[in-house]
Amino acid sequence: MRLPRPLFTTIFLTALCGLAAGAQAQAPDTRQQGQVSTLQLPAGEGAIDAAQGSVQFIGTATVLIRYQGFTILTDPNFLHKGDHVHLGYGLTSERKTNPAIAFDDLPPIDLVVLSHFHGDHFDQLVQKRLNRAVPIVSTRQAAASLEKLGFTRVTGLSPWDRLDVSKGEARLRVTATPGRHGPAGVAALLPKVMGSVLDFGADPAAPDYRMYISGDTLVIDDIKTVPERFPGIDLALLHLGGTRILGVVKVTMDGKDGVRMMQVVRPKKTIPIHYNDYDVFKSPLEDFAREVKAAGLEQEVVYLAHGETYTFTRAKR
């Protein structure tokens, strides 16, 4: 990556200010309840299978989630090894891996859950080729950008806002959770991000399965509220990688942060993603595995290679 020196200085000094000012630059979100939007999907064929679901790791932050008739795609990135994405402010990053599935081989998608609008999460191929009528849920900032690109079924959420999705008799609730893409000062220069809680099933008080996706965030105080509002998380997908701007300023979790996130959110199982696909990722999966072992959490982590699938069953409440 190359960056003009004046811009480097600006970003670096802003980072230092953000580290010093901390939470002053971004007040915590204290809302008790967010806004609720709804999405009605065409009913699928056949009975709802609530017994078993799956998560397939495609690469970077892209996974396919299948459960109860829903097929959900997260942070779609289908560039190949050697391709570059633009990250803003003149920054680019090179992809080091290939996706496990080609874009053309995707199944029909019911919903895209997008943590934020960044080139390594919604790449130029996806921007050009994804059907404009595919429903997408993301931050309000991302929603505005997506609508400018012609996407017609976009829902923008702020923290604690919720999208209620129905597909025949199947029900899904997607709730946006807090996230911050780096130290406070730097995060102000980057796209707004969100985590998300996916609750499957008709009973909001006792979902059939509860999943947390961190998004590109550090472990900030606001995330402590996630397990308070959503106890009993069955599976967490954590965006790791220790991404560093110019190799200096950390803007996503590294291995140690990932373990801290597990300890805060307290999921029953965790799958690490977003860790080795781009050259801006500076913390390899081995860092996380080492920290997991040191913390005695090995039985709570599932490691997936690109293309591998984790299957789960309805949770017991």
Predicted regions: what they are:
Residues 1-11:
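Bacterial N-terminal signal peptides that target proteins for export
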Residues 9-19:
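Bacterial N-terminal signal peptides
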Residues 27-50, 109-120, 138-209, 270, 291-315:
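Metallo-beta-lactamase
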Residues 40-47, 70-113, 124-129, 182-186, ...:
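Pre-active-site segment of Zn-dependent metallo-hydrolases
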Residues 48-101, 189-215:
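Conserved beta-strand hairpin/beta-sheet module of binuclear metal-dependent hydrolase folds
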Residues 95, 135, 141-144, 218-306:
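Cap/insert and terminal regions of metallo-dependent hydrolase folds
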Residues 106, 121-136, 190-195, 199, ...:
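Mobile, glycine- and charge-enriched loop segments
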